[in-house]
Design a protein with these regions (language model features):
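Acidic, low-complexity, intrinsically disordered interaction modules
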Residues: 11, 15-27
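Non-catalytic effector/regulatory segments
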Residues: 1, 17-19, 52
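Intrinsic disorder/low-complexity detector
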Residues: 6, 10, 29, 42, ...
Length: 56
C-alpha cells in the first residue's frame, strides 16, 4: 500500500492517493482541511482492511 499526500495551491486543498500495488487499485480524494484529508485516508485504509479480512 502506497499513500501520497500533497497540497494543491490552485485548488486550495489537500489531495491524497492510495495505491494497492498487489491488486493495482487506486483510491483518491481531497479536502480543504489537512485533518479531514487524513481522516479520509484513515477511513479508506480501514475499509480496505475490513474487506480484506472478510475475503479470508
Amino acid at each position: 500500500m502506497v499513500i501520497n499526500l500533497w497540497y494543491n495551491k490552485q485548488m486550495k486543498e489537500w489531495r491524497w492517493s492510495l495505491t494497492e500495488t498487489g491488486i493495482m487499485t487506486q483510491h483518491t480524494g481531497g479536502q480543504e482541511e489537512l485533518r479531514d484529508a487524513m481522516n479520509d485516508v484513515a477511513n479508506t485504509v480501514e475499509y480496505i482492511l475490513d474487506n480484506a479480512l472478510k475475503e479470508e
